[in-house]
């Protein structure tokens, strides 16, 4: 027997028992007569000690380095009261070693387990990084999350059904990862960005409650919470309304937070996309932050200051104010830093006004734009924003999108900088009623979610007549400013689906070429259906309290979509490329 107990499972009830442990040497202290070691496995750490009286095993112990893989046999002993370590779960006991087997000693480590290592070091030697207790704990939590989800889905009548990994390239927003076919020369599979169409086809096949914990792939620019391959908790249902789907999924997340964190999330509030953008400058608002944007275009449309009056009188303009309580204490340097910050989002500047004394008229206001605004205007602004003495007002004035993006980002930054955001709180919500389409810089329409999302209460003819103002029957679950899941009611009428494709500029020939199988399937008694997908990586990131999604994935990629450990991607064998009919062209480096 290689193991009778996990290290972290030992406690006072095991005193007097002989145990067999297998794990790694975590730490060594040589005190001359005794050698103390901490032995670690995935469940925790326990202290063992070697007595010099047993010369043979004492000699072996003297040769062991940190991270050597060993088997320990010994007797569990209660520590003296003065020696109890309350910082360790196993701190009331230790193990007197009677025998030791060295499975493998360890070379000098390329990582220092007691210091912060660089991200590159951690990813290159990921198998060592994952031995660290804090990393092991995150992956254990991830496993428990998936276990909870599977139980919940099984209890609610969902079937776990797998969908293909090698599929057809369809336009879903990001670039596809392509896989060349050897048998069908010149043709390519795509790795799925999501199982979207297959799960809809399963609804058409009569499997009215489907789920899958599935890998998805997107060839897109990465950031801290994105990976080229990621895992979804994918869900689809037939004969359920959007409200019923949201209730089912809310109950699952509510139960998950209770199970993992003992936190009651309460009832999730529901907010429209329009309200979220107006009040918070984001479609995934962080409600832990009490700051809100207040629109003031009607107050500033007649002032003699073009920076304010032009966007205030423009159909695509916006003028808004962010009131920061006690913000009048901000220094000019801090304000300049915020001005630079909003510039990242396209803002040309950041006007501000300090309300030093709300009862002193213009004399109580300090602002570089005060000369353009009279006392009546400031009085209206103070009343609209509920400003009081000691507050500061930040102004955003430009095109609607620029103001919304820049002021929404400023709201988050100020909330964190000034400790206004309650980082200990959990604030979930549903965001609903998204626009069906969004315009790009050239005025072309694209689907805000995906082209299979149903509009809300519109016929195909009504949608075609006014697509810009169409509202999608879509919903996102947001927790603490992160979109953790998103879904919608799907189109189940072939005419509506063709109408949406047409609005997106997909002609009939391309519709048949790319989506002919779907359009055919829609003709044969397709049920109303709706679904949702959660990002498992992001859920785990939130529950474990990490801000880097790579910390909750066993073998993640870098932000350059590379694996430093295996050195993937790598060059392909020339013979394999020849069989595939592929020639690799070298790109000229830009000078």
Curated annotation (Swiss-Prot):
GO cellular component: cytoplasm
Protein name as it appears in the record: Aspartate--tRNA ligase
Single biological process term from Gene Ontology: aspartyl-tRNA aminoacylation
UniProt binding sites for ATP: 218-220, 227, 483, 535-538
EC numbers, comma separated: 6.1.1.12
Annotated SUPFAM superfamilies: Class II aaRS and biotin synthetases, GAD domain-like, Nucleic acid-binding proteins
Amino acids binding L-aspartate: 172, 218, 449, 490
